């Protein structure tokens, strides 16, 4: 009798797909009610004046998306991520449409001023020194433009042009210590 062909073994069933990883939790919002505002009356008046310059509606409030600009106008340099965290990680729509009054702005400003993560002159110079191939205190302007447009908080071409205006010599080279002094004074 001819042998019946051996039955092929069924392939093992595919394993169940791994569960989707949980999305990373958004950075928790800062409890601004716990922030002690430590500004002098003169400072508060200066801050109120700067805040008022950004009030385009006349209701003594500014849009969420103006908070970082006001802080920068007051000499601080918060990242967009830091400001977003202060605002409770709002949506893009909220950034445009929600508004903040001056009294709510003060604890935000105090938080940024008290932040231990501030980079100083030497930190920025050290970061740019990596691109100083000659060891002579300069970097190529074109390379600096690429860095500004691709790393960290990416800048637009218009922002880079404004920042770099007058910084490159006739050979397209930038003295990075002078550049850092320039950007820290803007």
From Swiss-Prot:
The modification Blocked amino end (Met) is found at residue 1. Residues 12-26 have a biased composition (Pro residues). Keywords: Motor protein, Muscle protein, Myosin, Repeat. GO terms for molecular function: calcium ion binding. Residues 1-26 are annotated as: Disordered. Myosin is a hexamer of 2 heavy chains and 4 light chains. This is Myosin light chain 1, skeletal muscle isoform.
